[in-house]
Curated annotation (Swiss-Prot):
<keyword id="KW-0999">Mitochondrion inner membrane</keyword>
<dbReference type="GO" id="GO:0008121">
    <property type="term" value="F:ubiquinol-cytochrome-c reductase activity"/>
</dbReference>
<comment type="subunit">
    <text>Component of the ubiquinol-cytochrome c oxidoreductase (cytochrome b-c1 complex, complex III, CIII), a multisubunit enzyme composed of 11 subunits. The complex is composed of 3 respiratory subunits cytochrome b, cytochrome c1 and Rieske protein UQCRFS1, 2 core protein subunits UQCRC1/QCR1 and UQCRC2/QCR2, and 6 low-molecular weight protein subunits UQCRH/QCR6, UQCRB/QCR7, UQCRQ/QCR8, UQCR10/QCR9, UQCR11/QCR10 and subunit 9, the cleavage product of Rieske protein UQCRFS1.</text>
</comment>
<dbReference type="InterPro" id="IPR036811">
    <property type="entry name" value="Ubol_cytC_Rdtase_hinge_dom_sf"/>
</dbReference>
<protein>
    <recommendedName>
        <fullName>Cytochrome b-c1 complex subunit 6, mitochondrial</fullName>
    </recommendedName>
</protein>
<comment type="function">
    <text>Component of the ubiquinol-cytochrome c oxidoreductase, a multisubunit transmembrane complex that is part of the mitochondrial electron transport chain which drives oxidative phosphorylation.</text>
</comment>
<feature type="transit peptide" description="Mitochondrion">
    <location>
        <begin position="1"/>
        <end position="13"/>
    </location>
</feature>
<dbReference type="GO" id="GO:0006122">
    <property type="term" value="P:mitochondrial electron transport, ubiquinol to cytochrome c"/>
</dbReference>
<feature type="modified residue" description="N6-acetyllysine">
    <location>
        <position position="85"/>
    </location>
</feature>
<feature type="modified residue" description="N6-acetyllysine">
    <location>
        <position position="42"/>
    </location>
</feature>
<feature type="disulfide bond">
    <location>
        <begin position="37"/>
        <end position="81"/>
    </location>
</feature>
<feature type="compositionally biased region" description="Acidic residues">
    <location>
        <begin position="17"/>
        <end position="27"/>
    </location>
</feature>
<feature type="disulfide bond">
    <location>
        <begin position="53"/>
        <end position="67"/>
    </location>
</feature>
<keyword id="KW-1015">Disulfide bond</keyword>
<keyword id="KW-0496">Mitochondrion</keyword>
<dbReference type="InterPro" id="IPR023184">
    <property type="entry name" value="Ubol_cytC_Rdtase_hinge_dom"/>
</dbReference>
<keyword id="KW-0249">Electron transport</keyword>
Length: 91
């Protein structure tokens, strides 16, 4: 057994498929729950209002209107759902 073989044994198992299994990618439960909550009817409606406001504001060259209220409504609806579901997914 040569020096190169010993290094290979110390640094890797030699089987790429086995290494991939060992390195499972962790998924943030917050991201998953947020995506699920964004599909609910209340969040979909709030997002639609936000997108309409964004189009309206973007189409004007001069306006004092912003979409702060619509953004906060959407985030409130989504985060209300997330707060209810998130802790059920934690281990």
């Amino acid at each position: 057994m040569g020096l190169e073989d010993e290094r290979k044994m110390l640094t890797e198992s030699g089987d790429p498929e086995k290494e991939e299994e060992e390195e499972e990618e962790l998924v943030d439960p917050l991201t998953t729950v947020r995506e699920q909550c964004e599909q609910l009817e209340k969040c979909v409606k709030a997002r639609e209002r936000l997108e309409l406001c964004d189009k309206r504001v973007s189409s004007r060259s001069r306006t004092e209107e912003d979409c702060t209220e619509e953004l906060l409504d959407f985030l409130h609806a989504r985060d209300h759902c997330v707060a209810y579901k998130l802790f059920n997914n934690l281990k």
